Amino acid sequence: MIILNATKFCIATFLSNLGDVIYSVVIAWYIADVLQSGFLMGAVLFSLGLSRFIAGLLCGPVIDRIGAKLFLWLSDMIRAIIVLVLAILLWDHTISFVILIMVSVLFGAIDAFYWSASESIKPRLVATEYLSRLNSQYFTVVRTTIILGPLIAAWMVESISIEHSLIAISILYVFSTFLILFIDSKNSHLENMNDNNDKTSYFSDLRLGFSFLNRQKMIFYLVITMFFVNIGANGVNVLFPFLAKNVSGDAKYLGYIYSSMSMGSLLTGLIFSVKSIHKVELKIIYLSFLLQATGIAALCFTQNFLIILIFVFVIGLITGFIGVLIPTFVQRSVPIHLLGRVNSIMMAISMLSTPVAQFIFGVSVDYFNIKYLFFIAGALGIVTSLSSLLINERKGTPRETVM
């Protein structure tokens, strides 16, 4: 039953995330091809990111009170309805600026609830010793959709029109909700909550999540470290197109770079899908950040494309390892009745680094040599991870909380 629950969760995640990726590509193409507005593209991305950040800070107490499974189901069902309505509107009309912004705000908020609920439900599906495997399977599923989604979206737009593509996306969300319904809920969150939660207000629950992070300094330092390291790690995604252009001027080389990164991440995910990590320490996480940042900085020292691909593949391997370590550490260290609050706050702060990185490195490309920017991105991660390592060694690694 435990394996079956985890399997249904991973398949539902695959369907839901595949719908997300295809939707993002389809809407981006619609804006570029039909509306032809760079301003609208920027406004849609900004509203999506802003609403995701705000909802991420606020959604935790609600997930902890009502339960992660319900929010997974609601998130996919609401998205299915929204996308279907967009498809209907497109039959005879052009989607207006206001509607696209409203949908972006809704999708951003729903994403925050969905991803926080996904992280919160995992400890209820498998025993603690199998958490790293489930996190690896989850990571592998998400990375796979990121690879397949754009290819499927491109085929859909060319072959069956945007309207039919949106209907297909809606069907993916519906299938996901169907699987979520059949996840066994006898170990649901409501049975693991503190009795006092029913007597507290939403705002006191929200403060409890922030106060927990404030008390658990090592987890708080991890969140801050993630923010700054991710600025460098996300920044390289802005730099990769310019790197490919400098090396060859051929667009296919950019595809090779992204494929190399994805293959590294997938390999790590596959390895730890069958091999459990029994002990996760902050020291290992920070060392992984350090190796990742060193690999990024090393890209400034070579123009040989084969060596670049090897470095990028290794960076992908380490990124995949980090993607398994962090959720496993948090799930083992945070009491189960606080997971929604802590995960939502961590997600919001971590995701904030993406637009910051895109802005900083996007603007910097016009003024600095690309190899210096890779060095700066890596140096930021190196300094941050080394500082966190020193703080961790001085204060000692926190013990994992037994749930």
State the predicted function of each range.
Residues 8-24, 48-61, 67-82, 99-157, ...:
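Substrate-agnostic recognition of the 12-TM MFS/MFS-like secondary transporter fold
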Residues 35-37, 93-96, 158-165, 301-306, ...:
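Transmembrane helix interruption/hinge and helix-loop junction motifs
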Residues 1-51, 211, 215-261:
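Helix-loop boundary and gating motifs at the non-cytosolic
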Residues 97-102, 108, 133-191, 255, ...:
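Hydrophobic alpha-helical transmembrane segments
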Residues 47, 57, 65, 69-71, ...:
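C-terminal transmembrane bundle of multi-pass solute transporters/carriers
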Residues 1-3, 186-223:
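Juxtamembrane intracellular "pre-TM" segments in multi-pass secondary transporters
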Residues 32, 88-95, 307, 316:
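Helix-interface capping motifs at the ends of transmembrane segments in multi-pass membrane proteins
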Residues 81, 85-103, 279:
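Short, flexible, glycine-rich and Lys/Arg-enriched loop motifs at helix boundaries
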